Amino acid sequence: MAAKDVKLTKLAECAGCGAKVGAGELAKLLSDIKVRKDPNLLVGFDKADDAAVYKVTDDIALVETIDFFPPIADDPYTYGAIAAANALSDVYAMGGEPKVALNVMAVPEDMPSEVVHEILRGGYDKVYEAGANIVGGHSIYDSEPKYGLAVSGFVNPSKMYTNSGAHAGDVLILTKALGVGVITTAVKANMATAEEVDAAECSMMTLNRYARDIMVNYEVHAVTDVTGFSLMGHLLEMCQGADLAAEINVDGPEFLSPHVFELARLGILPAGMYRNRRYAEKYVEATGIARERVDVLFCPETSGGLLIAVAP
């Protein structure tokens, strides 16, 4: 296999966070797992939050997360950078700052070394942009490439955000445009324009660090990042955590391209959309809204924006 012949997205059945196990299936898998009680464990897996948080001192808590996925871009450097930005995002969603990371990688045994090197270089550069360091990792051979990071960061426990603190009357802010899941699926069908691909990749490579650094200056009550469970799925978790309902203007979110609705109408949708919709649609009232517009809101996003509940 020559490096020039490698089309990373052709080696994967699902792209990016579209490969994520659905929220409903995940809840069943974890339903009988006991949670060990620890007064210093501020956020564990039972909270369905973006990362775990463990209190070390009154002023310092450790933020822990891991995220990896199959290729969502053919260019190896771009893929590595997107995967890293996506993993780092969980720390930002908790209000924290990443400090160290470990590579998690699986590659075919015959993949050219220069391709693997470029994936890693993309990851390293994005982690360095975040002000953190990659300090090691683990790699295995697999027929399908996968890359991501285990990330550790820190947050002051008194300044930590969760996805369950929203207040009645809060305003919702989404910091990135939607449509990545539709566009990356359209790429596989040769139905996405170069401009749409560029817009999607640019969005996915953008760190949520910059949104985090702004939001800490405001009265923020809850935060989550919008990834594989879609805007609707992650908003549902936010609502359930606060025992609230939310109202969305379907024309409110920004979209990477108006073409995503036509693509959705034609059925160019990731498999994860159907998993997300099957799980969450019973909680959603969307009477009179065109099916394709709702479908896009259920589509998995990869390295999506922060969804912030803030006082008006």
Regions from the language model: what does each represent?
Residues 2-14, 25-28, 110-133, 142-145, ...:
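Glycine-/charge-enriched secondary-structure boundary and capping motifs
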Residues 1-93, 132, 167-173, 177:
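N-terminal glycine-rich phosphate/pyrophosphate-binding loops that anchor nucleotide-derived ligands
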Residues 41-43, 51-54, 90-92, 124, ...:
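A generic local secondary-structure boundary/capping motif
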Residues 32-35, 78-82, 165-167, 187-191, ...:
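Short, solvent-exposed amphipathic alpha-helical segments in soluble enzyme
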Residues 57-73, 97-192:
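Glycine-rich anion-binding loops of enzyme active sites
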